[in-house]
Amino acid sequence: MTKLTEDILWLSQKLEALRPELKIISISAKANDSFFVNSADSNTRLIAKQDIGEYRLEPMLQIAQSEYITKPQIFEIITNAQISKTEQKISSEFLIHAIGLVFAEANYLLHSHSTKVNKVLASKLGAKAFRGHVFEESVIICGKNPASIKFAESGYQLATAIYRELSSFQKIYFHLPKILLLENHGVVILAKNPKELITITKTLELWAELIYAAYQLGGPNYLSLDNVMNIETENRSTQNQEKTTIDKNLSEK
């Protein structure tokens, strides 16, 4: 069993505590030119070793950047991209993982249908409700700006929409998001390591819960833009200080 397979199994176990509100669809982890992902039909239980397959990234990226492609062609390419031949059920949603892992420069990705988040995303406000922060941890952990996508059908259409949004987001904000909010659908969490993925997921669940509750009492009291900027600046300064201290300690050894 590879380390990345172990990481996916570990994440499945740790995120189990958030069920049933957090419906885990799939978790992936990136290797060099490939990625590991669990099958779409394992989302009602803990992920098992046999649910996980390895796929080459490049063929998936070519699909996402194609102007036109048929469903049979998509499934043929995904099937041929499989490295570890298993009985795993092939899904066009694997494209989401390939695009997120590569173009968002993430190492781990969680796609979920969170009830708490979807209560907000399925409303008239949709992802706009997350344009403001109601507590400082969401700024620090989830990032100042989550990315969002209007409803798109699962598979190829959603994958290409994610590709376009990531490209646009980076041009506007000069960085990549940690969260993709999929209106009337769910969430994609993008992380550098397994622990960060769990922390972002838990914080987003709380953020959504607070926003939903606040609208029952007249609406959220969002932090001001100055508040958010100050929190972000202070957090960046703290991270830089910690990195400097670590580098200094390593150089003295």
What positions do the PLM features span?
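Glycine-rich flexible loops
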Residues: 1-253
